[in-house]
Amino acid sequence: MGVLGRVLLWLQLCALTQAVSKLWVPNTDFDVAANWSQNRTPCAGGAVEFPADKMVSVLVQEGHAVSDMLLPLDGELVLASGAGFGVSDVGSHLDCGAGEPAVFRDSDRFSWHDPHLWRSGDEAPGLFFVDAERVPCRHDDVFFPPSASFRVGLGPGASPVRVRSISALGRTFTRDEDLAVFLASRAGRLRFHGPGALSVGPEDCADPSGCVCGNAEAQPWICAALLQPLGGRCPQAACHSALRPQGQCCDLCGAVVLLTHGPAFDLERYRARILDTFLGLPQYHGLQVAVSKVPRSSRLREADTEIQVVLVENGPETGGAGRLARALLADVAENGEALGVLEATMRESGAHVWGSSAAGLAGGVAAAVLLALLVLLVAPPLLRRAGRLRWRRHEAAAPAGAPLGFRNPVFDVTASEELPLPRRLSLVPKAAADSTSHSYFVNPLFAGAEAEA
């Protein structure tokens, strides 16, 4: 039986035991453009450089001609059938930089706790998983692609990673003893690194109502890896009173239904009921649902777990999540006994805020305009009143009979000489001792000079 046949058989066995399979997505293959610094594979005749201090296993599936190659101190190149390297002169391809080597990207950048790097075998249209459950849970079967090279960081080690089984390099590990031997080998050290611990245990989820994921302790590292491309901060939800379900890193818009279940409840059957009976209706188009068992937040009741149903709106229509949540509550009221549901409650986010940033900007501009108009209307009377008060204070501050002169540095007029009061401009001729008539006026600043003239 080939590798693909073994994988398909294993997935069928997982379906019979209600185990969820998680597939590792990224790889460290030579022929993948995303693994190189310039987002393209090395050009023909170009130089190739691997970081000297990084351990890495690289699968090469094609033939390549290079002019120079710098290999890591501890690593391996796995050559597929027909693959190899040949020496060539420096290439002159237009897309290649002049003499710049193609550098293999850091192989330690992939983390086990990053939800972006996993794909679930239970993916279906309209179905999603909360962030903590996108990473392998303790009852999941983990598959690393048999036809690709990979390298995984196991995290800081504060929370050991435990899953049901691990399939890698054509082997399936279900016992800690076998996995420990593999991790200590050179092949294991090239593919798994970091202080974190990895263990397996054949713990089947035999409960039809489902099992808790078990990633609560690792959720801080899961959220940190998820939000790293966003600077470590959650994007603002586009609704009022946003919700944050258990296992989710950021707030979302929609609704959450919590079910108190009995022994007859079947998680897979109920998830299929939502997908087939409700999400197929036109009024619920664009909604996505996540159904899982979570620890009960309030321990006032006997049951320590409950079923969490998360409804998220991704389309332009709003209010669909709330309508579906109320429909699920009505379905429980009518068919709860047959479904094994004892009680149901719901929470719903508030109204959507479409274009909230633009609305906030427009509101700020409008407030600034109103404030400016108010200043223009109120300021002139206040300024006029303040001017009169200042003028009166200025007049009162000058005592009667005080000298009004000042020293003028240009004309050197002493301040002790009181300047005459200015006279009204007069163009009436003034008679002189002789018969000559002159038209003039007295300039108080030059009164002394004119008198001498």
Swiss-Prot record:
Disulfide bonding pattern of the chain: C43-C96, C137-C213, C205-C211, C223-C249, C234-C250, C239-C253
Ranges in the topological domain labelled Extracellular: 20-357
Outcome following mutation: C234F: In IGS2; loss of interaction with CUBN; strongly reduced CUBN expression at the cell surface
GO cellular component entries: apical plasma membrane; brush border membrane; clathrin-coated pit; endocytic vesicle; endosome membrane; extracellular exosome; extracellular space; membrane
Limits of the VWFC domain: 202-254
Outcome of mutating L59P: Loss of interaction with CUBN and strongly reduced CUBN expression at the cell surface
Assembly and oligomerization: Interacts (via extracellular region) with CUBN/cubilin, giving rise to a huge complex containing one AMN chain and three CUBN chains.
Domain notes: The complex formed by AMN and CUBN is composed of a 400 Angstrom long stem and a globular crown region. The stem region is probably formed by AMN and the CUBN N-terminal region, including the EGF-like domains. The crown is probably formed by the CUBN CUB domains.
Name recorded for this polypeptide: Protein amnionless
